[in-house]
Amino acid sequence: MICQDPWRGRHNHRDHRNAGQATFDAVYPYARDHLHFPEQLEEGLETHKVLEIYATMTENPDVIVDISDCIHDEINALKEHKSQIGDPDALEQRILSNTSELAESHGFEYAEGFKRHTFSFGRAPTPKTQA
C-alpha cells in the first residue's frame, strides 16, 4: 500500500495528512478485522491483511527507489492539476532538483523516498526491497 505520510511535520496539506491517516486506519485494524464490517462477510468478501505501507512525502525515508525511467510521467501527471499549479515549469524544475538530490548518493539519476511501515500480524516482516 502506498499513501502520503500522515506524520510529516513540514509543509503538508491537511487533506493529504488526513488521507494518509485514513489509509493507515483502514489497513489496521479495519481491513484485517472481520468485526468491523460483518456485512461484507455476508456478501462473500474476505478480510485482507496489508503487510506493508510505503509512505510518500516523508522526511525520513528508509526506502529509496530509482524513478529515472518514469520521472517525466510523474511530472506530466502533476501538471494536469492545472488549478493547483501556478507555474508548471517551476514545478518541474523543483521536482527534478529534489529527486536528483535524493538520487545522488544512491547512484540513480532520480529517486523517490518512502518510509516503510510493516504489519507482521504474528509473521516475520519481509526484508526491505529497493527497485
Question: Could you say what each language-model-derived stretch is?
Answer:
Residues 1-131:
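Metal-dependent de-N-acetylase/amidase catalytic core
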